[in-house]
């Protein structure tokens, strides 16, 4: 069946990740969570909860810093830290989404050294702006097709213009329904 990947960045967050997980559970859908090591260290149980629900857990960063603002050595050390914390939980990521999707000349080389695929997105909810769920859905509908990767957030990363993820939680059910109406199965990255 054709698929659309649902992805969430910047967690786990003790308030918003459980709400996103509950919304996905209610909709009967899975997703991929690109996590921050600094958040995983504070809330490791949320990673286990996501995995228990059938979601994928992948790498975002240890600290949310753009590769444009880092040296290769700093980015490699940041990646090593988040991989170490995930390894301690028994999680072996296969994918890496860099903060803001920004890559440096050396990003893919570091990824290859760790056996990671660098993954971006094709449909951006821009939920960091705090728009209503209906507006976010309207924005991603034109890009909802087989193989699409939808970007949303279960945490409040740097640059967020909102103070919560209520609208992202509210987006899950209509987004899943819209995908299914188009003959797409929403789920984790394959």
Regions found by a protein language model. Give the residues of each.
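C-terminal domain-boundary segment and adjacent tail
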Residues: 26-27, 41, 162-190
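A short acidic, helix-capping loop that chelates divalent metal ions and anchors anionic groups
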Residues: 65-70, 158-162
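A cross-domain feature marking catalytic cores of carbohydrate-active enzymes
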Residues: 8-10, 35-38, 59-61, 97-100, ...
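Active-site beta->alpha N-cap acidic-glycine motif
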Residues: 1-66, 74, 78-85, 91, ...
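His/Asp/Glu-enriched short active-site or ligand-binding loop at hydrolase and phosphoryl-transfer sites
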Residues: 92, 102, 107-143, 184-190
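Charged helix-capping and loop-helix junction motifs
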Residues: 74-79, 132-138, 165-170
């Amino acid at each position: 069946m054709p698929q659309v990947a649902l992805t969430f960045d910047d967690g786990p967050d003790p308030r918003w990740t459980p709400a996103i997980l509950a919304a996905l559970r209610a909709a009967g859908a899975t997703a991929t969570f690109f996590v921050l090591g600094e958040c995983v260290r504070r809330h490791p149980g949320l990673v286990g909860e996501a995995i228990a629900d059938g979601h994928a857990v992948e790498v975002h960063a240890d600290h949310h810093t753009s590769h444009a603002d880092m040296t290769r050595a700093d980015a490699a050390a940041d990646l090593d830290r988040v991989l170490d914390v995930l390894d301690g939980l028994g999680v072996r990521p296969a994918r890496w989404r860099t903060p803001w999707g920004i890559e440096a000349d050396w990003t893919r080389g570091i990824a290859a050294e760790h056996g990671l695929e660098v993954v971006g997105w094709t449909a951006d909810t821009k939920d960091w702006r705090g728009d209503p769920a209906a507006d976010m859905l309207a924005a991603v509908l034109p890009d909802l097709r087989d193989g699409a990767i939808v970007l949303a957030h279960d945490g409040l990363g740097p640059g967020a213009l909102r103070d919560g993820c209520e609208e992202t939680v509210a987006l899950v059910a209509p987004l899943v329904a819209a995908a299914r109406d188009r003959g797409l199965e929403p789920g984790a990255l394959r």
